[in-house]
């Protein structure tokens, strides 16, 4: 049961459900369940939602250090590049474009970009593990796109299984390096990322281009929520650095 009466919160630029959940001591799932008409991937500035805080409402004006802003910028850019180059690869496969190999090579540079954001805080061994797992995620996803394009259902099913197993491994790895990275929460976000990406791939390959674009917009919002989750975990684990 909620401890306090609900407040009415007005969505501001930059708000995400994860950020609001952290700010008010609740969860993303509870925010969604409390606001059934809410689209979690398309928060509108000025939109009003109900929030049941689990502690006294904090000030909406809170201070963020320069170091935290820098971390957030680097984390956001790394994950946005992740989905952007994945989309470029999808478009190249779907359209049999000549830039496929060059696009794939650029896509596979992204795991190091993401790993380097974590390297500063966790060292080379953990950063290299993150890089390996994200590389596997991209390679499996790339092979899956090709299998779906070629209507190879048997191979696609095998790759789907490997893709989700890789997500489980990532959730396990992240949960071990930071107590603020709940394995269940990381797994939930990664599974949602795979679901939305699968939706994007299906729409693109079937020529549903408007739906394809909407899928990508959902992925953008979801990946920024995930990026913010990782940033907040680092800030809480290493408060002296921020």
What does each model-identified segment do?
Residues 1-25, 47, 55-56:
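Primarily a LysM-type cell-wall glycan-binding module
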Residues 32-39:
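Short acidic beta-strand-loop surface patches of small beta-rich interaction domains
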Residues 59-64, 117-118, 172-175:
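Short, charged/polar, low-complexity loop and linker segments
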Residues 68-93, 104-107, 111, 148, ...:
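C-terminal amphipathic alpha-helix
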Residues 106-124, 132-134:
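A glycine-rich, hydrophobic loop/mini-helix early in the fold
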Residues 124-158, 163:
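Mid-length scaffold segments of soluble, non-membrane domains
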